[in-house]
């Protein structure tokens, strides 16, 4: 899932300081799952903004908080917010960067304030209470060849043909030796499966054209039936 983190309150307050009417919109997708941007977090941010204005002796803030199914879906965002957004000059979004941009596109006359920093595509380790980056969305997945361990993401240098000379005792030289060397993990995984032929396979340099930005994916739009 997309992993995100709420911005510092000071930064959110600064972006919102010139608005007397604000709509806070959470997202029930990724940011809600990781408890950063759902309905509960929207209500908490609403209370904090109201408190901040009162403590500074400013005029009363008119603010509403809600959450929608997915902010990254044009139709859902437009349909869910069309009636409520018209009363507010600015919207605080608790979605990832995609959600923020979707709202900005659908409501071009509104100021969309991002309250969340999008970090990476990752895995949640509930027991450790941590999120780990696992995928770069590179557009050319080779996980079958690497035992389900991504060298593009988990190797600090994104090497494709084995470890560099900087690994020591299975640890990467980048990050003060805290991270496992991805290619040592790959070697051990493939060895367990008797698939070391995949480890020794030579891989050509990546074709970065498949990950050029901005990207799009999808077929041709549906043809509308002509009216008789």
Language model regions located:
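Short, well-ordered alpha-helical microsegments
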Residues: 99-102
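N-terminal glycine-rich "phosphate-gripper" loop used for MgATP/nucleotide binding
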Residues: 93-97
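Iron-sulfur (Fe-S) cluster-binding modules
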Residues: 1-67, 75, 79-91, 105-118, ...
């Amino acid at each position: 899932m997309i992993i995100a983190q709420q911005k510092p309150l000071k930064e959110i307050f600064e972006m919102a300081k010139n608005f007397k009417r604000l709509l806070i919109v959470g997202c029930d997708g990724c940011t809600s799952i990781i408890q950063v941007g759902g309905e509960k977090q929207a209500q908490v941010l609403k209370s904090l903004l109201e408190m901040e204005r009162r403590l500074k002796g400013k005029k009363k803030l008119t603010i509403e908080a809600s959450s929608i199914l997915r902010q990254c879906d044009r139709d859902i965002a437009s349909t869910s917010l069309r009636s409520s957004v018209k009363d507010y000059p600015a919207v605080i979004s608790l979605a990832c960067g995609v959600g923020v941009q979707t709202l900005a596109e659908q409501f071009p006359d509104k100021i969309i304030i991002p309250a969340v920093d999008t970090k990476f595509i990752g895995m949640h380790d509930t027991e450790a209470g941590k999120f780990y980056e696992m995928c770069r969305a590179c557009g050319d997945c080779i996980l079958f060849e690497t035992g389900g361990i991504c060298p593009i993401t988990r190797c600090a240098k994104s090497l494709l043909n084995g470890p560099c000379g900087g690994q020591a005792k299975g640890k990467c030289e980048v990050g003060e030796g805290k991270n496992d060397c991805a290619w040592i993990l790959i070697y051990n995984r493939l060895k367990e499966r008797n698939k070391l032929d995949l480890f020794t396979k030579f891989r050509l340099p990546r074709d970065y054209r498949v990950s050029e930005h901005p990207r799009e994916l999808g077929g041709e739009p549906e043809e509308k039936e002509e009216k008789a």
